[in-house]
Amino acid sequence: MTESGSVTGSRSVPVLARGPRAWTAWAAGVWSLAFGAAGVHWAAGGAGFPFGAADPRAVQVGSLFAEAEPGSTGPAIAALGLLGVAVALVMARSAGARLPLVFAWAMSVGLVVAVPDVRVIQNFGYLFAGYTGLWDGPLLFMLFCIGGGALWAAAAWTYQGGGAREPVRWGTPVTYAAALLALPYGISRISWAMGIPLGVQPEMLAGGNATGGSVVEAVLGGLCVAGAILTLGLVQRWGEVFPRWMPLLRGRRVPIGLAVVPALCASAMLVQSGARLYLWVAKGDIVLKADGWGSFGPGLAWLPWGLALAAATYAYYLRRRAE
């Protein structure tokens, strides 16, 4: 089939076109179909609605959908899912139109940043401590939405033909900035694990450590420190070639995706959670005091940390792709 121009300036291709642009669009469309079907189910009174009164922790964690009701939110989800299917079909068949690209990026940001809340990063950290007691339906729906956001980001990325082609000069400084921004939260939690009441009253720390909180704090702090070290790998030789002390892998090239995918996942969690903290500060829900700043103060580094990590990952991707 030959390509032909359209009113929008896009290029028509076969419906079953192959290649990254086509299959990422189809994947986003299939996800949107499932998303819309869930909306229809909830609008019809089906069980499992993940927002509002069905989510007992929604208000506590500052969910943007704490007041949502299935009768109004269900149809909205159904309509958005249907629109997503239609846009995905357009993206799979043509390239160059602006509106589908804007929709795809808006869907990605909304699904990754707006729908999830701090429970995602909270349960990610607790998972390393072996605790899964807070897993529930709303959390699973958040993860489902994050997956959908990733699919829409991939569809948008391939639809626009990728990003810049040349390595950027700011990659190294922004990578070091991301590594440094990982430390405030890590230092505070490691201090708590060691019994040092950094930024909190000793009574609060003693109560938490008596119930095993020191183990959790050590894990959370250790994750931050490990994240800082791994971030440095984005500009170090061992981030491109496996070091000698790694059996079977030594000397082999590090797959780009092995560094990029986990870093982007971490960045998404940090941005979505960090944005919530700033929203709470703006609303006056969080007030930093001299004897209690350690509870939330270090978390204010999450948003800039996540943004810097995303930028550092992008710079790494461009540098490795140019090899």
Where does each model-flagged region fall?
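Cytoplasmic membrane-interface segments at the C-terminal ends of transmembrane helices
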Residues: V15-W23, A86-L99, W152-V174, I229-V254, ...
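Alpha-helical transmembrane segments of multi-pass integral membrane proteins
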Residues: G29-H41, A106-P116, F144-L151, T172-M194, ...
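Juxtamembrane loop-transmembrane helix junctions in multi-pass integral membrane proteins
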Residues: L16-W26, F65-A68, A95-R98, T132-L139, ...
